[in-house]
């Protein structure tokens, strides 16, 4: 078990309306200092399909995709004890200052990528924000029961239901 501190800056603009939250960056994401960096993680391809866009390949393209659709991206946790990338191993979770992030934008909806991030958000952050979260299926390769197309369909349905960006 390793003590991990979140060091990746959130992707956000003052126009962001929907905040997408993971739990804590994986070792590969921490190594590359960018979100969902593990090559088997399907977040970026699923989000691009959901938004009817080509899959971004560079960090700059990924940031542009998020901002173009008035989204924001961060993680629930600032620090925790964790084994590898196993969300189920998390101990001593400390949340990021999500209320302060929300205050600098137009965020009015929160999406969590998986049940662990949703559980931690609901317990540690919701009491301050009062914004309930919607749970997206985990994009992790460990969620093998869902094909990429299924993930994209769920992401699209949820984002379209929440966002004025599609109006």
Regions found by a protein language model. Give the residues of each.
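Short, glycine/serine-rich, charged loops/turns that create anion-binding
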Residues: 25-28, 78, 117, 140
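C-terminal capping/extension of enzyme domains
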Residues: 2-17, 39, 84-99, 122-167
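Internal catalytic-core helix/loop-beta-alpha segment
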Residues: 68-116
């Amino acid at each position: 078990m390793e003590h991990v501190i979140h060091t990746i800056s959130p992707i956000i603009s003052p126009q962001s309306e929907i905040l997408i939250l993971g739990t804590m960056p994986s070792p590969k994401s921490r190594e590359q200092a960018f979100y969902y960096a593990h090559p088997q993680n399907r977040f970026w391809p699923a989000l691009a399909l959901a938004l009817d866009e080509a899959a971004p390949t560079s960090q700059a393209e990924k940031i542009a995709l998020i901002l173009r659709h008035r989204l924001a991206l961060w993680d629930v946790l600032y620090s925790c004890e964790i084994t590898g990338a196993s969300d189920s191993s998390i101990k001593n979770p400390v949340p990021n200052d999500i209320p302060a992030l929300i205050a600098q934008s137009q965020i009015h909806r929160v999406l969590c990528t998986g049940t662990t991030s949703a559980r931690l958000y609901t317990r540690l952050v919701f009491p301050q924000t009062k914004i309930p979260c919607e749970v997206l299926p985990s994009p992790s390769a460990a969620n093998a029961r869902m094909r990429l197309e299924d993930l994209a369909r769920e992401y699209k349905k949820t984002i379209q239901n929440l966002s004025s960006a599609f109006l």
